[in-house]
Amino acid sequence: MKFILATRKSPLALVQTEMVAARLRQKIPGAECDLLKVVTTGDRQAEWSLSKQGGKGLFTAELEQALLRGDAHVAVHSCKDLPGENTPGLIVAGYLPREDVRDVLVLREGVTEPRTIATSSPRRQLQIKQLFPGATFTEIRGNVDTRLRKIAGGLADATILAAAGMNRLGIREWPGVVFRPLKLQESVPAVGQGAIALQCRQETIPLLRDVFDAGTARSVDVERAIQAAVGGGCQIAFAAHVSGDTLHFFHERTGVRTLPLTGADFANPAEAAKRLLGELNFHA
């Protein structure tokens, strides 16, 4: 069978979609893949502040429309770009094996205590402020390599990037900057960070069952259930990450918290979200 994979055009998106294509060919005998390259609203509006615009669906809506029109079988997303709720008629069917989930502090060479940090993410801003209380923040947009060049060129003292994206692009070092991976307690990752999500119509799921990684789904399904229960988009400072049987939770109202998870939580993520938010005394 030939699969049409809808993807953004950025270098990272194309690398991730090629990973999905390779997985399909590996797991499904005779599978062929073509890429449908789509420009999203977030790609077109390169000067927008994502936090002020809300960020919800800015990098996913056009890919979803391609699925709904029948132009593609699968949309390939960075899971952290997806809203918490499913779009009617579509489902996040599964994930590829998860990459390194950590955030990475990118420091301009010679800087140890950054005064200006370029990040548009309220989640990252509020958490990194605990490490560098005197820092101020500025906006930054662009692909991974663009952001690295901007920091090396002096736009700001530092920025924060996802380790997963840099690893997939093969970036281990960059002239003029130094990489410092952040611990989970220093920067709780975004929901789904490090996971590549495969979204499709319901009838496509049986074709893909052998492709998905169960371990990644076990964690990300709980994270996304919490995201849906909390509500909001990129404009709020919120994070949830499942590591083993532990939930790492961050919200501007609670700070960083950790809670144990049970087998029942993984069996019913929606109920788990209610229980966990209740224990945190969090009310959306």
What kind of region is each of these model predictions?
Residues 1-39, 45, 52, 125, ...:
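Small-molecule-sensing regulatory modules
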Residues 4-6, 75, 93, 118, ...:
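Short, well-ordered beta-strand segments
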Residues 42-47, 75, 83-86:
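Short active-site-adjacent helix-start/loop capping segments
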Residues 47-74:
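Short, structured active-site "lid" loops
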Residues 70, 112-113, 154:
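Structured loop/turn residues at beta-strand edges in well-structured enzyme cores
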Residues 72-76, 157-158:
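Short, Asp-centered acidic motifs that coordinate Mg2+ and/or phosphate
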Residues 74-75, 79, 242:
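A short, hydrophobic beta-strand-centered structural micro-motif
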Residues 79-82, 86-138, 196:
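A conserved helix-loop-strand patch within extracytoplasmic ligand-binding domains
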